[in-house]
Amino acid sequence: TQTLKAIYEPILLAAFAENEAAYAAGTAIPNIISTPFMSCFSTITGAGITGGLVIAIMIFSRREDYRAIAKLAIPCAVFNINEPLIFGLPIVMNPILAVPFMIAPAVSAAFAYFMTAVGFAGRMVVNAPWTTPPVLMAFLSSGGSGGAAVTQIICIAIAVLIYIPFVIIANRQQTAE
């Protein structure tokens, strides 16, 4: 995420500036994708939407090591911090968990784009701090759109569904060892 940020961040910030100006002027918000859109729907609970991984582990994992780390990561995930999972499970250098880590944000962003395009979720007009908890972040960033908050909840649920098969594979991998 951070590697490509130098390329896409200026574009997203310009789109956000246009949204912010339109919101202040009381005109139609022009851009769906902007910096807060990515924060709200692509990096919820941290890069890779790892809050979905925490939920999947707590429900489906039989690995005590994964469950212990997931329990420690819950308060961090609430504030979009996922380093305990990235380095504790680890996700780094773990092909089983790296795959959903890359897929979940893309699927979530595509879903959120659709929900915004059809008018269910409001467009982003406020750049809430990245540590703002999920649901509240979407609500604030969209200028009070309940649809954006609901969309963010659905995006986390989608991430859980994406992570489940990989958590089950990790269970089987431990059994094989």
For the regions a language model picked out, list residue spans one by one.
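Pore-lining transmembrane helices
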Residues: 1-174
